Structures are given as C-alpha cells and as structure tokens.
C-alpha cells in the first residue's frame, strides 16, 4: 500500500507538485495560477467538487487528451495516481500548491476532510 507523502518533499515520476504564487497579507492570503506561466498548459475548463460525503471517492478515470492541475483550495484529500506500472499517493492540503496530472494517468481522489474543496484546472474542455 502506498503512503501519502508530504508535498514539500515530493518529486514524483507520475505526478508533479507545483507551488503557486502566494501573496501573504494580514487581510487574507492570495494565490494565483496562470496557464502557461504557473502551470504548463492553457486552461480550458475549471471545475470543483465540494460537499463530498465521508468515505466517497471521486475521479476513478484517466484522460487521453487532457492534463489537469488539482488544488485543495480548502481542507484536504488524497490523490492516488496510477500509470499502470506504479502508484503514488499525494496528500493535498495547501491552497498554494497543486498536483499536475499528465495524460493517461489514472487518478482517484478520496479521504476528503469535512468542508474540503477540490479545484481542477483542465487543459481540455472534454
């Protein structure tokens, strides 16, 4: 069984953690993700999941023509990536970091904390 890894320590061959711009302000912090600048593709679609029931899983598929960048904008969850040869589990729990998922990588999201929000920036509108 794979174990979740801290994002600061991760250099994965299946997925890649990317730190986003972070502006710290006493009034509240701000992070930015720009296509072709912070992430390596143009963003065609943005979607998010929320109110995920305890024990539920999301994803459970791969995309043949679409890379995705997954961010835990609130709370935490795990993402399991599988390329058919290797599996790796990532704990996403910082709104200023995200996980780049390449084409043809199977992804499953689970272990959502209460109130977790998963934001996905997708390369294609599929």
Which role does the model predict for each range below?
Residues 94-99, 104-111:
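Well-ordered alpha/beta subsegment
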């Amino acid at each position: 069984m794979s174990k979740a890894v801290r994002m600061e320590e991760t250099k994965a061959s299946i997925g890649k953690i990317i730190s986003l711009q972070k502006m710290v302000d006493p009034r509240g912090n701000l992070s930015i993700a720009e296509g072709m600048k912070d992430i390596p593709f143009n963003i065609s679609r943005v979607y998010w999941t929320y109110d995920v029931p305890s024990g539920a899983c999301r994803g459970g598929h791969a995309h043949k023509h679409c890379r995705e960048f997954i961010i835990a904008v609130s709370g935490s969850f795990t993402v399991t990536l599988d390329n058919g040869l290797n599996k790796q589990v990532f704990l996403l729990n910082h709104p200023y970091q995200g996980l780049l998922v390449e084409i043809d990588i199977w992804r499953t999201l689970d272990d959502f904390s209460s109130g977790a929000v998963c934001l996905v920036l997708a390369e294609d509108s599929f």
